[in-house]
Each structure stands twice: as structure tokens, then as C-alpha cells.
């Protein structure tokens, strides 16, 4: 699972309301959700984001309301995954359940707009300025993400058995 794309950098405490603001969040349609991702924080995001791009946050990325639409909007927009110093617990689980990879660690070396190559299995991120190492998802969660999310995982295996 190696991707290459542009960094979309955000700060600390990015809430699910920042990712998909409630007043726009009236649909479950992935294409519509992709259009509202970061509509108030970065209006250009939905027009300019490309498949393989990476969202980078600071501490507490995805805090706030229990909105599956926040993770779904990023995946639907083509975001390859999210790298942050820490995640809101519900966003973290929603992302895994939807098949959106996550890495955890110090993001201070990643700059907005730079191109990165991310190995989501190992946590290695290559930039023009060097190589950075992040904590990848553990084995079971990584397998769920690699299957495309929890529903695909169960459909292929018949249950949640990890053996």
C-alpha cells in the first residue's frame, strides 16, 4: 500500500464539523460528501484534491460529533489516508471501518502542498526533505483497511475471525 500525492495540512483539533459542516451534511451520497469536505476551512479542497493526496493534521484530528460522513467524505474525495499526531477515537474507528488508512506521529516535518510517498503498511513517508517514520495501524486494523473496510472484510471472510 504505497501512494503518492500532495499534502493538505491542517492544524490541531480539526473537528468532524470542520471536515463536513453540519449545515451541508444532509446526504449519505459519497460524491456529495466529497464536494463538502473542508468546504469552510479550505474551500478549494474539493476542486483541487487528487486521488492519492494525503490529509495531515496535528493533535486530535477528527474530534467532535460521531460523523461517519467525515471519514467518508475524505475517502470519496480520493484522499489516500490521514496522518496526524493523534485522532479522535470515533473518527479513527470510522476511518478504519471505511478503509481509510491512518498513521500516527510527529507531523511537523510535513509541509502543506509538498508531494509525499507514503507506505501505509510500514509508516514510512518520503518527502523531498527526507524520510519520516510514523506508527502504522496494527495488524488486524490494517487488514480491515486493506480489504476496503469492515463490510468488505466481513463479506470476504464471513465473520471477524482474525485467524
UniProtKB/Swiss-Prot annotation:
Sequence intervals crossing the membrane: none
The keyword Protein transport is assigned to this record: no
Catalytic activity field: (2R,3S)-3-isopropylmalate = (2S)-2-isopropylmalate
Keyword rRNA-binding: no
Example GO biological process: L-leucine biosynthetic process
Keywords associated with the record: Amino-acid biosynthesis, Branched-chain amino acid biosynthesis, Leucine biosynthesis, Lyase
EC number assigned by the record: 4.2.1.33
Annotated pathway: Amino-acid biosynthesis; L-leucine biosynthesis; L-leucine from 3-methyl-2-oxobutanoate: step 2/4
GO MF term list: 3-isopropylmalate dehydratase activity
InterPro entries referenced in this protein's UniProt entry, alphabetically: Aconitase/3IPM_dehydase_swvl, AconitaseA/IPMdHydase_ssu_swvl, LeuD, LeuD_type2/HacB/DmdB
Function comment: Catalyzes the isomerization between 2-isopropylmalate and 3-isopropylmalate, via the formation of 2-isopropylmaleate.
Oligomer and partners: Heterodimer of LeuC and LeuD.
Similarity remark: Belongs to the LeuD family. LeuD type 2 subfamily.
Protein name as catalogued: 3-isopropylmalate dehydratase small subunit
Organism from which the protein derives: Thermococcus kodakarensis (strain ATCC BAA-918 / JCM 12380 / KOD1) (Pyrococcus kodakaraensis (strain KOD1))
Organism phylogeny: Archaea, Methanobacteriati, Methanobacteriota, Thermococci, Thermococcales
Gene name in the database record: leuD
Amino acid at each position: 500500500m504505497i501512494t503518492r500525492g500532495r499534502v493538505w495540512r491542517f492544524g490541531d483539533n480539526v473537528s468532524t464539523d470542520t471536515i463536513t459542516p453540519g449545515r451541508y451534511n444532509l446526504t449519505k451520497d459519497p460524491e456529495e460528501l466529497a464536494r463538502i469536505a473542508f468546504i469552510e476551512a479550505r474551500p478549494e479542497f474539493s476542486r483541487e484534491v487528487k486521488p492519492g493526496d494525503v490529509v495531515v493534521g496535528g493533535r486530535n484530528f477528527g474530534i467532535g460529533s460521531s460523523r461517519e460522513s467525515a471519514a467518508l467524505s475524505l475517502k470519496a474525495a480520493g484522499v489516500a489516508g490521514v496522518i496526524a499526531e493523534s485522532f479522535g477515537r470515533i473518527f479513527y474507528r470510522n476511518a478504519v471501518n471505511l478503509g481509510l488508512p491512518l498513521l500516527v506521529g510527529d507531523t511537523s516535518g510535513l509541509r502543506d502542498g509538498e508531494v509525499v510517498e507514503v507506505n501505509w503498511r510500514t509508516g514510512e513517508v518520503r518527502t523531498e526533505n527526507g524520510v519520516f517514520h510514523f506508527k502504522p495501524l496494527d495488524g488486524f486494523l490494517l487488514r480491515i483497511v486493506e480489504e476496503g473496510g469492515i463490510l468488505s472484510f466481513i463479506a470476504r471472510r464471513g465473520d471477524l475471525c482474525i485467524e
